[in-house]
Amino acid sequence: MTDPNSKAPRLQGRQEDKQTQTPPPRPPPPPQPPLTPRPDSSPHQNSHNKPKPEEEGTDGGPPASQGDRKRSKGDQGPDTGPGLGPGRAPSPKPTPLGPPPGPGPRRSARLGPLQADRDPGEGPQVPAEGEVEGHPGGDQGHPPPTPPAPHNGHSGHGPKVQQPEGPEGREGHEEGAVGGDCGDEEGHPPPPPPPTNGHEGGLLSSVASLLVKWEGHFDQLVQSIQDDLEDYWKKLATPQ
């Protein structure tokens, strides 16, 4: 039979051997590729870090400069115009036409280039004084004003006939006063007395005579009404 206490020192000896034993060395890391240097940002290289190929001329000569290439397109330059040789001078530019002489309406900025093509002599016609749209020539197209219509005698604005002063004129005033009383009975006011030559004395005398006549007629009318009322009361008082 084995002693159980004999296993304990063996296990302890194995644990001590594991602690004292060194681990195996790690494998070296894989080699990394070499880093490419960053290209310097220069105006002669494009975005792909590739140098531009040297441009050669069409006939195999040295590369043309930028100014020569610009001149070769249409032969345009500071001394040559489009389609002209180097020896010919460019034609002068047409100057814009100025405003036509004389007063005229204001031109807007949008209509400026359109109206500049017109002849300066064909400026807008300025309307003369008194002319209106649709009526050229001022008062030439308008007919003269029509005279007012004459008033008839019934409206009361007709011509007034002057009556001579004296007894004949007074008789005429009396007849007019009688006619005025008849008009009062019908509901129309009496016509005003006509003036006599613009003299205040004659006018006052005619007005006074008319007032006297109207007062007499009024008294007669009142007296007749009173007589009729008395007769009416008498008829009512008498038995039938």
Curated annotation (Swiss-Prot):
Keywords: Early protein, Host cytoplasm, Host G2/M cell cycle arrest by virus, Host nucleus, Host-virus interaction, Modulation of host cell cycle by virus, Phosphoprotein. Residues 67-76, 167-176 have a biased composition (Basic and acidic residues). Residues 1-204 are annotated as: Disordered. Transmembrane segments: none annotated. GO terms for cellular component: host cell cytoplasm; host cell nucleus. Residues 22-37, 89-104 have a biased composition (Pro residues). Signal peptide: none annotated. Contributes to multiple aspects of the viral life cycle including viral genome amplification, suppression of suprabasal cell differentiation and egress of newly formed virions. Induces host cell cycle arrest at the G2 phase by associating with and preventing the nuclear entry of host CDK1/cyclin B1 complexes. Inhibits cellular DNA replication by preventing loading of host replication licensing proteins MCM2 and MCM7 onto chromatin. Within the cytoplasm, associates with host kinase SRPK1, a splicing factor regulator, and inhibits its activity. Assembles into oligomeric complexes. Interacts with host CDK1. Interacts with host SRPK1; this interaction may favor expression of late viral transcripts. Interacts with host cytokeratin components KRT8 and KRT18. This is Protein E4. The lineage of its organism: Viruses, Monodnaviria, Shotokuvirae, Cossaviricota, Papovaviricetes.
